[in-house]
UniProtKB/Swiss-Prot annotation:
It comes from Bos taurus (Bovine). Cu cation binds at H16, D26, H86, H90. Up-regulated in stimulated inflammatory effector cells. This is Protein S100-A12. Ca(2+) 1 binds at S19, H24, T27, E32. GO terms for molecular function: calcium ion binding; calcium-dependent protein binding; RAGE receptor binding. One of its GO terms (biological process) is mast cell degranulation. Residues 13-48, 49-84 form the EF-hand domain. One of its GO terms (cellular component) is cytoskeleton. Ca(2+) 2 binds at D62, D64, D66, E73. CDD domains: calgranulins. It is a peripheral membrane protein.
Amino acid sequence: MTKLEDHLEGIINIFHQYSVRVGHFDTLNKRELKQLITKELPKTLQNTKDQPTIDKIFQDLDADKDGAVSFEEFVVLVSRVLKTAHIDIHKE
């Protein structure tokens, strides 16, 4: 497997590590999303310990408004984080 393929698989595995805890095995509820963000992206996403911030992120990601974040919706967060990281790298 290439380095990129390995990282892609890692993103999928991290999602599944949190999505299988409660409810549907392939979606994140608000609590699971908060746990994933605070444990896996603590330096990347600021102010994620306060509930209003988590509520806003969840609301933005839950495109179909079903009360859960699917993998497809989670990829939007990953994409935003990658774009920001890319911009930040060029600032250094």
